[in-house]
Amino acid sequence: HCGLVGSEMCIRDRNIELFQYENENYYAVYGWSSRDRENVPNPNTVWNLAKGKTLTPNTPVTLQWTSPKGVIFEREISIDEDFLFTIKQRVFNQSNATIDLAAYGILARHSAPETIGFYILHEGIVGYDDGELVELSYDDITDQKYDDRERANLEIYEITENGWIGFTDKYWMSTLVGEPQSKFKMASKYNEANDIYQADIRHPLQSIGSGQSTEIKTYLFAGAKEVNTIKTYQKEADFADFID
């Protein structure tokens, strides 16, 4: 694994580097959004290693950061042998006021990759929206309706039970998976100004009172599209219709 930088994650799968953060080509980002931007971590935040040393299937790691107002953010990251990450984002509000936060996860890809163009092979965004398969080519993503607020071509999916979204290539897939039987939003997005394609998971806004805490769990699969592995996640982890 090539490591963590701020809120960004880069992954090497055996001898294949699937995500790259050095030149900002392809990466995963986790965080919290809030109107009080100084009270949440950002891409330049320096996290402390609170627990663990090296991320392995047997040893998770926990990162921690405390905001100027005394809100503690933790991110626990674990991984299995087939490159399924479990991400637990925790907030402990030790400030004197209620805070409103919404957790998110983003897969970002700068510029469309070169695709094979074979008609029976889908390359682009793939997802699952409460029983409906989502498949978008890179051209489809750029053709989405423009959203003035986000300044991007955007499609939002309201999830009530099961959903996942990500990018699929010929042999590899990177996918954000929401916790089964939970409500959240997914988004496919294209920012023309920066030529960035995104697949997002957006969790509902939460109000966390002083002295209270919360935890959001999501999954990130970033590995080979091995049928037996994918079927195992579909059956044992309840990732609905994970075979794309």
Predicted features by range, described:
Residues 2-6:
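Positively charged, low-complexity/disordered segments
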Residues 7-8, 12-243:
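Soluble non-transmembrane domains of integral membrane proteins
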